């Protein structure tokens, strides 16, 4: 379950509101993936579909995980006790 958001734009998308951060088609995908993250009981639940490409991040982002929205955008989050914290949509380019 999502417990906190790192930014207000990601929270808006999760609650079904329009954001200027992403175009409309990208927001639909982000919304679907955020709902998937919210429903995940275990990190392994995010392994499907394979297009999520669940990753444990390294370096300066150690402690974070991500799933892909597309090649450019990812949803990054901290996973602790079966919950997601500091959820945010990040532009990787």
Go through each PLM region and give its residues.
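Residue-level signal for pocket-adjacent positions within structured domains
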Residues: 8-9, 17, 41, 49-52, ...
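Basic, amphipathic alpha-helical segments enriched in Lys/Arg and hydrophobic/aromatic residues
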Residues: 35-37, 41
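Arg/Lys-rich, positively charged N-terminal/basic patches that mediate binding to nucleic acids
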Residues: 1-33
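Generic structural signal for well-ordered secondary structure
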Residues: 3, 27-30, 46-50, 70
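Enriched for short, Lys/Arg-rich terminal
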Residues: 55-58, 64-93
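A short, surface-exposed loop/turn module that caps and links secondary-structure elements
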Residues: 41-65
């Amino acid at each position: 379950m999502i417990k906190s958001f790192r930014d207000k734009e990601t929270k808006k998308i999760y609650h079904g509101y329009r954001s200027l951060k992403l175009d409309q088609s990208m927001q639909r995908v982000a919304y679907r993936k955020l709902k998937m993250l919210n429903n995940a009981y275990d990190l392994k639940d995010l392994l499907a579909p394979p297009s999520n490409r669940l990753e444990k991040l390294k370096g300066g982002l150690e402690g974070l995980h991500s799933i892909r929205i597309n090649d450019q955008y990812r949803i990054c989050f901290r996973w602790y006790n079966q919950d997601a914290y500091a959820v945010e949509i990040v532009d990787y380019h």
